[in-house]
């Protein structure tokens, strides 16, 4: 049956024209994911080629027309679509297109919401990390020994519970409930420690305290405004991002609308949708051209909602600007009144006004006190100089006296040293004589010891000789006995006697051997004693020669010592005379030394007292100078702070003005965007109501088309590459597992890699 074209019908009503625009086929968007076309599915196997005009400027129009044709052809090919009448396909395509556009809108909203959720999750994690870092820092600081040491240095907590001084908060966020709740558990410890620190700090003048309080208030206000500004800037940035996204979507939609209204797109749609199957194509194409031309023209009635939307936006912006202008006028009036008051006060300031201030009075009293102290210090300085001159003269006289006494003492000590040297020489001579006598006695004792040893050796030799002589006597006695026995007849001697004689001869032989050994030892001892005597006599001769030489030297030393002794005796006599004279001088010097020591003790006491007084005066002088320097530094610092605060106030006023202008501009933009958002929401609700009015039957028909033709249970989501038919994934996998790998519609075989997932 012939298929009716999907081109919109021209109408003078703006709502009907927009409804027809919504029923246009969805174009391919780079940001949206379009369903896979049959051409794309078959191009995987290499069965199709790119369009020859793909690189031309009108490729977007080709994509639109090809997308429509592909969707319709694919749906008709896979499901065997047959239309009973010409009205049904137009309605089904329109509903499909509307559903598709709604799905794309949902996808875009989903993407934007996911992006916002991602940003919010990042911000939440960052804030959680900041809070975690703050908690860990507090736990580390309050749990460490540093705070304990500070508490010990500050003293016990009971001492300061009575009068606890208040301290200025650098934040002053007393009106923020969340901040108070977050720090409620930690506020007691923080306030306790900070109040104790503030109490132990030195008290400053009331002017400085007032300036500090004003500075703290200004800083708190500045931080509050900065926080509000950051909040407004973040909201502005979010609104700008949403505005950019909305404008981008609006531009894309406008571009799609222009493409859908073009005559070329209508012709291509007619060519690809109807094709050669439609015999009455000329009349339809003529009607399509007329309708597209009528759609291309913009009637006057279509401008109504756009003008209303712009009018509402401008009205909201103007109302917001009026409110802002009224606020600015009131603020300017208040500021002008304050400026005039301040100018009047500043122009009327005189010297009396400055003189009546507390700061001037304090500085005046400090100046008078410093002048009095300086005059007193000058008078004491003159007295101390005079006393120093007197002490110097006394010190020079005492130094001269001490020098004379030391010279006399040195001369006396030198005389004593000379006497000690003479005594030392005499003692050394006596020591040498004693050492020589000792050596002589030692040599005599050694000679006596050697003589005794030699006598003992001779006695041992004599004993050995006696033993040898005794053995000789025994031998001779035995010989005499043998001689007597041999006088008898030897033939008559029996064997036993011969044996006894033999034994006697053996004993005689042994005795001869012992006699020979004793004689050998005696001869050896005699020879050793003789050689030792010869060496001893030679050593004695050498010793005698050495002793004679030493004796001659000792005689010479003795004569020299005697001469020096006579000279020393003369010196001793003279020194004794001098000693008797110097004893009187020493007694006099001791008396004068005692007097000088008492005088020196008195002078040292006076010097120590004057030094203490001088040190105290110098310390006071340094303290006053330091106090003056500190006061000057404090004054300069306060002047610098005043100048800095002035410059800071001017810069903050400029930044506040710029930020307020930026906030006003952002508020106007927000109001305009809110108005446009309300209008777009209204138009969206209107179009939703129009599009979803009578779509129950078409929805059921589309649902039956989207169901699988085999199981009638699941939706079609898997396409077979070899033939292009679409079934559900369960049916395809069931065919693969049962090894009946053929298409249910055309019985064409397919393998494990011959099917793909699609999205309708």
UniProtKB/Swiss-Prot annotation:
Cellular compartments per GO CC: HULC complex; nucleus
One GO BP: protein ubiquitination
Subcellular location: Nucleus
Keyword presence, Coiled coil: yes
Region Disordered, residue ranges: 1-58, 274-306
Keywords carried by this UniProt record: Chromatin regulator, Coiled coil, Metal-binding, Nucleus, Transferase, Ubl conjugation pathway, Zinc, Zinc-finger
Pathway: Protein modification; protein ubiquitination
Coiled coil: 210-263, 309-561, 594-691
Protein name: E3 ubiquitin-protein ligase bre1
Species in which this protein is naturally found: Aspergillus oryzae (strain ATCC 42149 / RIB 40)
């Amino acid at each position: 049956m012939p298929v009716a074209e999907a081109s919109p019908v021209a109408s003078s009503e703006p709502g009907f024209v927009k409804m027809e625009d919504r029923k246009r086929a969805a174009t391919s968007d780079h940001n949206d994911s379009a369903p896979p076309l049959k051409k794309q599915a078959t191009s995987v196997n290499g069965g199709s080629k790119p369009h020859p005009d793909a690189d031309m400027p009108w490729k977007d129009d080709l994509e639109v027309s090809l997308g429509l044709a592909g969707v319709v052809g694919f749906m008709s090919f896979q499901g065997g679509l047959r239309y009973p009448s010409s009205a049904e396909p137009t309605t089904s395509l329109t509903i499909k297109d509307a559903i598709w556009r709604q799905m794309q809108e949902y996808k875009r909203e989903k993407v934007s919401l996911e992006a916002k959720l991602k940003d919010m999750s990042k911000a939440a994690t960052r804030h959680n990390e900041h809070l975690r870092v703050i908690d860990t820092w507090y736990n580390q600081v309050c749990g460490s020994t540093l705070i304990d040491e500070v508490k010990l240095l500050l003293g016990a907590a009971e001492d300061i519970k009575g009068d606890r001084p208040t301290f200025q908060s650098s934040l002053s966020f007393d009106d923020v409930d969340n901040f108070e709740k977050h720090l409620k558990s930690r506020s007691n410890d923080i306030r306790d420690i900070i109040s104790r620190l503030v109490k132990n700090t030195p008290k400053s003048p009331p002017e400085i305290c007032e300036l500090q309080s004003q500075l703290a208030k200004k800083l708190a206000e500045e931080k509050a405004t900065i926080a509000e500004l950051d909040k407004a800037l973040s909201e502005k940035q979010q609104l700008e991002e949403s505005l950019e996204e909305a404008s981008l979507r609006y531009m894309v939609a406008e571009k799609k609308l222009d493409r859908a209204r073009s005559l070329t797109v209508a012709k291509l749609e007619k060519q690809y949708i109807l094709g050669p199957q439609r015999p009455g194509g000329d009349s339809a194409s003529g009607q399509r051209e007329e309708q597209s031309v009528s759609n291309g023209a913009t009637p006057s009635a279509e401008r109504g909602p756009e003008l209303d939307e712009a009018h509402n936006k401008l009205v909201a912006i103007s109302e917001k600007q009026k409110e802002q202008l009224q606020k600015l006028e009131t603020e300017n009036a208040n500021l002008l009144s304050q400026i005039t008051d301040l100018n009047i006060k500043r122009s009327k300031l005189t010297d009396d006004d400055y003189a009546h201030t507390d700061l001037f009075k304090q500085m005046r009293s400090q100046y008078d006190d410093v002048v009095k102290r300086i005059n007193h210090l000058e008078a004491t300085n003159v007295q101390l100089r005079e006393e120093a001159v007197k002490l110097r003269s006394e010190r020079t006289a005492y130094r001269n006296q001490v020098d004379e006494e030391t010279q006399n003492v040195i001369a006396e000590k030198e005389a004593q040293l000379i006497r000690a040297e003479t005594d030392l020489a005499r003692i050394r001579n006596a020591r040498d004589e004693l050492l020589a006598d000792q050596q002589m006695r030692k040599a005599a004792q050694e000679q006596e010891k050697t003589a005794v040893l030699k006598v003992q050796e001779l006695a041992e030799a004599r004993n050995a000789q006696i033993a040898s002589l005794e053995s000789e006597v025994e031998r001779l006695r035995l010989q005499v006995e043998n001689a007597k026995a041999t006088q008898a007849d030897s033939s008559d001697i029996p064997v036993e006697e011969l044996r006894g004689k033999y034994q006697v001869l053996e004993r005689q032989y042994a005795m001869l051997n012992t006699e020979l050994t004793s004689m050998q030892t005696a001869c050896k001892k005699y020879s050793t004693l003789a050689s030792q005597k010869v060496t001893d006599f030679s050593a004695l001769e050498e010793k005698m020669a050495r002793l004679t030489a030493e004796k001659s030297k000792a005689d010479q030393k003795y004569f020299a010592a005697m001469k020096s002794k006579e000279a020393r005796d003369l010196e001793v006599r003279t020194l004794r005379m001098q000693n008797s004279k110097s004893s009187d001088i020493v007694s006099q010097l001791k008396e004068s030394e005692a007097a000088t020591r008492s005088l020196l003790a008195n002078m040292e006491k006076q010097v120590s007292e004057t030094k203490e007084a001088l040190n105290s005066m110098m310390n006071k002088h340094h303290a006053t100078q330091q106090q003056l320097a500190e006061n000057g530094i404090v004054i300069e610092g306060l002047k610098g702070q005043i100048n800095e605060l002035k410059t800071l106030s001017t810069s903050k006023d400029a930044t506040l003005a710029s930020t307020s202008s930026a906030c006003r501009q952002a508020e106007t933009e927000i109001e305009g965007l809110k108005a446009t958002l309300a209008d777009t929401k209204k138009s969206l609700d209107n179009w939703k109501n129009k599009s979803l009015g009578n779509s129950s039957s078409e929805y059921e028909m589309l649902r039956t088309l989207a169901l699988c033709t085999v199981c009638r249970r699941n939706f079609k989501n898997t396409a077979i590459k070899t033939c292009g038919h679409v079934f559900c994934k369960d049916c395809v996998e069931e065919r693969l597992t049962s090894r009946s790998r053929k298409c249910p519609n055309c019985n064409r075989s397919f393998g494990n890699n011959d099917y793909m997932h699609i999205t309708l």
